[in-house]
Amino acid sequence: MNWRNYGELMIDTIDFAKKWDKPDLVVGIARSGIIPATILALHWNVSLCSLQDYINGQFSMGCGLRYQDPKEIKNVMIVDDSIHMGGTIAEAKRLVKKANFNHKVGWAVIYADDDKDYENIIFHKTIRQGRLFQWNWTSHKEMLSHSVWDIDGCMCVKPTVEQNDDGEKYRKFLLNAPPLYLPQYPINGIVTSRLEKFRPETEQWLKKHNVKYKELIMLNYPTGRSR
């Protein structure tokens, strides 16, 4: 599995920026492309906007540098975090072509699937499938369908020592635990050290947060102390 976290994305994006002349405007393809686009705009000290705002002629996200006159913009770089089949950028190119701006537009991604020609899209590194990124792994449908998750410290926060009393305080925690990372698609299963006797509360929480799974495996011990 090829994994990239936020820190590695930051480093790779800055390394990418050093190889290219700065544009007048950086455009991020939402959602994931907004992250490297923001890093690039800050590094180059240029204006930033989302693809949708760009298409609508709003060349600023409303803070920091901005262009009062669109005629000031000569070069634009449109950025996404990665490319695989190229469908997202193909759609973005269609929208940009339809907008019919007069300035020069370049296309870039930080990570490509391989070294093939992506139709004038520049990229920084090759990271092959299967790959997961910290900033969007919960929405990776294919990977999630084969994955097995824990709950405490993963889907939700861990209970405090006071909450973890194996009684009513713990039951209240199980029903109301603040979520952390929730899968956006069905997962293969859940394995937890929670006790079997707390299955009703656990299943209620999972249903409340729309977590879909095939199997929930819990520990069959009478008390937390006996685990």
Q: Which residue ranges define each predicted feature?
A:
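Short, well-structured secondary-structure segments
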Residues: 187-199, 214-219
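PRPP-associated nucleotide enzymes
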Residues: 1-149, 154-184, 196-212
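His/Asp/Glu-enriched short active-site or ligand-binding loop at hydrolase and phosphoryl-transfer sites
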Residues: 41, 213-227
